[in-house]
Each structure stands twice: as structure tokens, then as C-alpha cells.
């Protein structure tokens, strides 16, 4: 199949489908009903539906009917050192559908200094010709340059982009200073955008990387050692603090550690509009693998922020996800082949970062959260689909089983056992970080745009059948609260009378005083310290004085100062 320029192929005609005998699960309710799909939309929900003849019927047999998953954190063609991640939009979205995800939001990652608009069009074209499922695009702001504001305005107003990621890490590449973050947050709030933050302290990471390499540590364990969770937590705190001063919502991507999650949870209790997104990897595995004797296995887990070496972290993050302190699960899907990872075989800083998870995400969440009793089925729908749809202004078109919503539907079997393995996954990489994990919960049937794309373990898709889904700015789930808070908590000056008292006249000083020569450059000339030395003075008495005829007193030794004798070594 050939593609010239923009996608010219017709979308596959949607089937008329009737899902009968299922239990519909939304984020806020569960009930038994039939669902009729036509023209890519949910047309009817209820019992004893009247439908046209020739409709294909799917017997759900009491199983769960849930909204298709939405993965808002993928990197399907991320550049790294002249390479791109192993899964393109065809292979990546094919894997997503096999796991029950029917929409992704991928990251556009421009080269620093390059045009955001040009990069967006490049990603858009690649996704439009290859994607198997619906998609949208974040645009990462990799540098804050002249003209970036105009491009951001065009992306929001004309291109259907309402979310942008900024970086606090990757010094001398993507990293922004605090003042740039403040400037970017302020401008993006005015556009009604969702601000995503990669939160790590890039300055300290750069110092730690240098120190650890100098110690002779070059393997994947150096990646974790140079990025301790304190550096993630500090950056999360700083991002929330900056956003709080501006009263703008902030979304922390890839929450990987207990410390970072705790800061988000505490901040939400105090009021800031902050959202946290753990990924499948941080919920399903840990960073102990960085110390594996098998270099290729250890390198497979390299991602940033790194997975926590604390093996209790996944369970802890799952608990916070279940209680609402964290709200969305992504995958951070950005796998590189073992050969690509091996570019950093002698230097951990050169290992391209990224893990798999686009296919495993929903199964991992079900197994770790619902099958353990931490989370109910409605919360599962919320953290895998609905919350993302609300935050990124896709709701209720996506993220809900309702009349008028897109016909992106999954029949989910909570009891089906699945063993995750690279031998059967849809990704092109030869490893899987969840290798051998036995999980409860898996999709039986996946429907995208009203068409069955996955059934009985078989996937049926074609390149380019996915659609670009534009997103409008100012999502109500976020900005309704922003508007109210601006009115209620706006800054106001104090009404007071004018001060009419004396004003001290400060002598004018030059803005840039010439520095005094250092002792090293003028060793023969003593330089007085910058503060007044009471033992040095050019004051002298000369000439006749009024008391010259008075007899002089001899010196007296003061035995005890006023207030009595003191001893600095005694507190008594």
C-alpha cells in the first residue's frame, strides 16, 4: 500500500455490532446492558434493543464491557543519538490494540532549536500513514527560543494540540532553568494548555554522572546511582511550587519513586492542581534489575527517571493510584533494541533510554491493583482511560461507554491468565521487561472505531486506519478550577494612605564597580578587607588641643568589665 503526502487511503468501513449480555463498566457506575455500535459511534445502550438486520452479534456472557484504554505517554519515533526507538507508529499502535488500548497520545520531540511546527508536521505525517488506532500528539518544548510563543499559539489554535512537555533534566540538551519554566508555565496557562513536566534535577544529575564515571562505574547500575530518587522528588516539588505561584495545572509524567509520589499526594491535599502519572514499568517491576550480571537485561530497564531500586515501590505506587493520589497510568513506551542499547556498553550515559509497556499497561494495572483488591473495576477504568480523557479534553468522546461516544470498546476478561513474554508480544524488540510475569486480566475483544481489531488472540489491522484526534484548549476538568481560584485567591494591593515622611537619600553608586586587584596579582600591596577594620585608621590628631594642659592619666588595667567577670567556657 503506497502513501503520497497526507493520508489518502479510506478508513476501513465500520461494522454494525451488537454486544449482548455484557456488564458495562464506567468510572462512576456498573450495570448490565447491551450496546449497539454503528458508524464508529455508540448508538444505543439498553435491553431488548431494536437494531437493523445483518448486525454482527458478540456474546459478552456477563463479562466486562469497558471504554478502550488511553495511553497518554508514548514515544514511537523518539530520536536518540541518530537512532529512533524500535517501534514505529504501526508496530506500536498494533501492540497497543492487542493490550486493550484504543488511543495513544505520542510525544513530538524536536531537536533543540528546531521548529516545533516543523517537528509536529513530521510526526503527524508519520502517524497518519502508519497508526492503527486513534492518536493525538503532545509537543515537547526542547528549547525556549525567540519565536517559540508564536509557534505554540499556532499549535493550540490551528493544529489541535493542547498539551506540551517541558524538561527539568538533560542539561545542555532539553533542560530549562527555573525562570524559563516560570515564563513557559505563564504563557501556556494563557493558551489553556496542559503542562507536562519531566521532573528530575538535571544539574545535579550531570555532576553525579561525572563523579560515578570517574569512579570507574560504567554499567547500567550507574544510571540508577546517578539519578537517586531525591533528585526526582526535588524537581517534582519545584515544579509544583512554580505552578502554584502561577495558578496553573501541572501534570507530572513518569512518577517512579515513593518520594516523588508522596510530594504529589501532599501537594494535592494542600490545594495545587497537580496530577501524577506512574507508568506500567513503575507499577509492575523495579530497579533491582540494573544490577543484573546480564548487561543486556540490565540495560533493557534503563529509562528516566529510573525505576526505583527499592522493590517495595511498585506496591506503594499502586496503593497511591488506588486511593486517588495518583490519577493516570501511562506506559512511557520507548523501547530500543539490544543493539541500540549497546551503544552505551562502555558508558551508561550513552544507553538510549526507554522501556516497553504499551501492550502490557492495562493487564499490569489490573493484576497489581484490581486482582489484589486495592482498586475496584470503576477505578480501573478511571486510571486507564477516563481520567486521561478528562485531563486532555477528550471526554466524553473517549473514556466512556455512552450514547454518542466513539465506538472504542473492550470486552475484558478479569479471570483470564496471561504470561507476558517477548516471544508473543507485538513489539519489535527482542526483550520484555515484564518477562515471565503471570497476570490476571486480559482483553478478549477489542473494538476500534466500531470495528473488531482483536479477537481470540488474533489482531486484524492495517496501516493508516487510525485518526488524528484534535484536542481543544482549556479542558474544563482543569481550567474550571483555575478560573474560580483566580477570582477567589487573586492578589490585591493594600489600600493605604500615601507615606509623606522623610526619605533617606541613597548615594548614587556605579552599577559595575571595578574589582580591586587580588592579593595574588599584587602580593606586595596589602588589600584591606571589605569590612571596616577598627584597628586601622588614617585619623590623627595634630596641632594644639584644648586639654593639652591637663595631666595625663596612666593606663589602668580593667579587672572586670561592666556587669561582672565572664567566662566563655562556662554556661553558669
Swiss-Prot record:
Query: Does the keyword Phosphoprotein belong to this entry?
Result: yes
Carrying Phosphotyrosine, the residues are 504
Polar residues compositional bias, start-end: 534-543
CDD domains in the cross-refs: D-HYD
Motif annotated as Required for interaction with FLNA, chain positions: 246-247
Identify residues that carry Phosphothreonine: 101-102, 509
What does the subunit comment say? Homotetramer, and heterotetramer with DPYSL2, DPYSL3, DPYSL4 or DPYSL5. Interacts with PLXNA1. Interacts with FLNA (via calponin-homology (CH) domain 1 and filamin repeat 24); the interaction alters FLNA ternary structure and thus promotes FLNA dissociation from F-actin.
Name under which the protein is recorded: Dihydropyrimidinase-related protein 1
Q: Which organism is it from?
A: Mus musculus (Mouse)
Gene (UniProt)? Crmp1
